[in-house]
Amino acid sequence: MDEIEAGIQKFHELVKGLDAAVQAVVPVKPANSIFLISLTKGANRKFITIPEDDIIDLPNEADVRSNVTKVVKDAIAGM
């Protein structure tokens, strides 16, 4: 498993930990070093952007995990 795959897996775990009803669709590759991620809950959908470096660092960096968690929480709250 490479760094991006590990980060994407950790992202999915993070989303499920916040709200199991939310489905996240993460592209396999970033566009311009940014991941455009779709979060769906029922009929509601939000898009968020996460930098490639943050996805790579997500499993190991607590401050990155905290920032990404805040972005995801804000998106879920807006659904």
Where do the protein language model's features map onto the residues?
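Generic hydrophobic secondary-structure signal
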Residues: I37-L39, I50, V72, A77
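Short amphipathic beta-strand/extended segments with alternating polar/hydrophobic composition
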Residues: K46-D53
